[in-house]
Amino acid sequence: YWNMQGSGKVKFDASAGFYDEWGDIPALEYKTKMNFIKIAKLKKGILYHLKIEQASDLKIPTKRLSLGYFYVQKNRIMRIWENNDYEAQGNVWTLSKKTLNRIIKTSEIPKYSTIVWQKKTYKDTLKHDKIDWHQYLKKIQDSPKKRLRYGGYYQYPQHSGYWETFIWEEGTGLIFYQSGYRDGVECIMLKRQGVKLPSDVWYD
């Protein structure tokens, strides 16, 4: 599911919408590249940092260009979380230099890290209105190839906050990514070029 053996770039079709200086959210479609940056070889796999390139016609906040750090192992992919402050982390998946150096030196992963791909799926175990980070990993039905979707969102008292989706395809790797707030505010959507997806791919 993870097709990169070293650092590299993969082409994606993208669309994004962010508030401009007039308070509007113009939608922009463009082409970009996903940077799979190899950080270190650990005991059970490789640590990568995923970043997308800045759009030329739209200023995407720098913190949203990073998808975070991923520990890629033979049987699973883990998203590295430094702590459990999901609300604060919502739109910036970064690691302190201290934590990153400790991971590289010891191969020990922070306990709050989460599995975004493995063969065994899982359901959200929290009550739907619980204020916390909700997540699941499920199979996508009626697909020509084996595909898995990871979804996560932060639940507030009256509505959901930040949310994101990853879709992985066997033999290809990451084919789709989307993140934003509530009803598509400050949204980024990425689709791997050459991959066909249904128009309603972001729905369950």
Residue spans for each PLM region:
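Conserved functional acidic sites
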Residues: Y1-D204
